[in-house]
């Protein structure tokens, strides 16, 4: 296999793309007949995520269930020996335990049971669907195409309808398109930025242009945390693979210019990303995030060991907060770790932290062992960015956010299969 086939960014861009597609076709042809449709279905995932939550959830759930059935039929339990897999099962067990002892056990157990489809999907990607690096690269390419298709959709919305209250809503009809770019598209975005910093030839210009264009659309969506995730992830990707100061500084300057240019051309969004961020910092009662997160802390104090029950916060918050409290209820506390404390207690918090840390460390070690491969070197950034504690977040046990988030985490976890090869890049 040629050098350009071994990884991304090692040669002429068009030749690399041709090799990736041909390698994927060969890999699919080598699969057992019954497995081939599932792998093709997996590769189409980024486009299901562009439709709506129900088709996307069906895609993810079918593949997670198929992996579980396949493992039972083949009596394949080798994947259970991996540290991050065991950590996920430990966290799930604590969630089930918390739900069982809550005052609404039927509801909480149902939520805890259904949530596990997300880490199970990550296991399916790592130990089945993305085990062949040729299909892993194909999925990364599919994710990149999906990300650029989303930027095209959002560009069309800007030209046809414009922003609505400083936000964009296409193609879903609600305020979440930035989730696709920042979460589902994060593995591809990290590779794009790394290639823009350290690849050769025309690849640098094309990857830099595509990354900058999608970054501009992130600003226009008006989703602040998602923009920060992409900026920070891009910064880390730039220093994680074949780092060179001169190109890295150039990419950083271009990113800053892109963001400032959007502010200048679309002045209505500037305040949302500057003064509004400072006002919303959860440092006092004047911040709504402080009052919402504080409600989660109060729920933790109400049941510190096992919490109030998985996904129970929205149901029980009003009974926990006293009338006239400085805090207020919402569907969730808007921070993953506060939500873990509130709903699964200190045991769930410790188990959840262990699970997330195990995933990040598995990918970081794999990247260090294969530093010349851009996908392996940047994969750890995805769970680190998406689970970073100092940010406001969506519902940890919810549906739509988890579909975006775990589709990216699943793709990144498959990078543990990449092994360093002599002469690869």
Regions found by a protein language model. Give the residues of each.
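Long extracytoplasmic/lumenal interhelical loops at the membrane interface
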Residues: 280-294, 302, 306-344
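A membrane-periplasm/extracellular boundary helix in multi-pass inner-membrane enzymes
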Residues: 221, 238-285, 294-302, 310
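Transmembrane alpha-helices of multi-pass inner-membrane enzymes
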Residues: 62-68, 190-191, 234-235, 379-391, ...
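Alpha-helical transmembrane segments of multi-pass inner-membrane proteins
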Residues: 46, 120, 134-166, 173-242, ...
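Membrane-interface catalytic loops of GT-C/OST-like multi-pass glycosylation enzymes that act
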Residues: 106-110, 178, 221-229, 330-335, ...
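Membrane-embedded alpha-helical segments of multi-pass membrane proteins
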Residues: 54-71, 112-124, 180-189, 227-235, ...
């Amino acid at each position: 296999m040629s050098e350009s086939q071994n990884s991304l960014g090692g040669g002429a861009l068009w030749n690399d793309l041709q090799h990736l597609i041909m390698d994927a076709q060969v890999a699919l042809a080598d699969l057992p007949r019954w497995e081939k449709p599932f792998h093709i279905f997996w590769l189409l995932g980024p486009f299901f995520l562009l439709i709506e939550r129900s088709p996307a959830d069906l895609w993810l759930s079918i593949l997670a269930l198929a992996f579980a059935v396949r493992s039972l039929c083949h009596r394949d339990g080798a994947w259970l020996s991996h540290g991050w897999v065991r950590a996920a099962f430990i966290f799930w067990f604590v969630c089930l335990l918390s739900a069982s002892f809550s005052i609404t056990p039927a509801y909480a157990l149902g939520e805890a049971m259904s949530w596990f489809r997300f880490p199970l999907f990550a296991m399916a990607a790592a130990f089945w669907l993305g085990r062949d690096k040729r299909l892993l690269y194909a999925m990364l390419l599919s994710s990149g195409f999906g990300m650029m298709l989303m930027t095209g959709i959002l560009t069309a919305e800007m030209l046809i309808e414009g922003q609505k209250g400083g936000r964009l809503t296409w193609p879903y009809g609600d305020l979440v398109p930035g989730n696709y770019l920042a979460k589902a598209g994060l593995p591809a975005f990290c590779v794009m930025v790394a290639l823009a910093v350290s690849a050769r030839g025309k690849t640098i210009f094309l990857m830099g242009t595509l990354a900058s264009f999608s970054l501009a659309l992130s600003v226009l969506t008006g989703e602040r945390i998602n923009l920060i995730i992409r900026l920070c992830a891009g910064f880390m990707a730039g220093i994680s693979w074949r780092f060179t100061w001169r190109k890295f500084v150039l990419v950083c300057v271009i990113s800053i210019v892109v963001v400032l240019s959007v502010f200048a051309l679309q002045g209505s969004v500037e305040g949302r990303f500057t003064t509004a961020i400072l006002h919303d910092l959860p440092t006092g009662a004047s911040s709504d995030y402080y009052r919402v997160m504080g409600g989660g802390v109060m729920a933790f104090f109400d049941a510190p060991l096992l919490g109030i029950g998985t996904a129970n916060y929205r149901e029980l918050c009003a009974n926990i907060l006293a009338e006239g409290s400085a805090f207020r209820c919402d569907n969730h506390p808007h921070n993953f770790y506060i939500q873990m404390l509130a709903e699964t207690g200190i045991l769930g918090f410790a188990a959840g932290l262990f699970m997330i840390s195990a995933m990040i460390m598995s990918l970081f070690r794999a990247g260090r062992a294969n530093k010349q491969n851009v996908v392996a070197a940047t994969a750890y950034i995805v769970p680190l960015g998406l689970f970073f504690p100092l940010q406001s977040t969506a519902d940890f046990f919810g549906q739509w956010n988890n579909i975006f988030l775990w589709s990216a985490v699943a793709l990144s976890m498959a990078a543990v299969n990449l092994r360093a090869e002599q002469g690869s890049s």
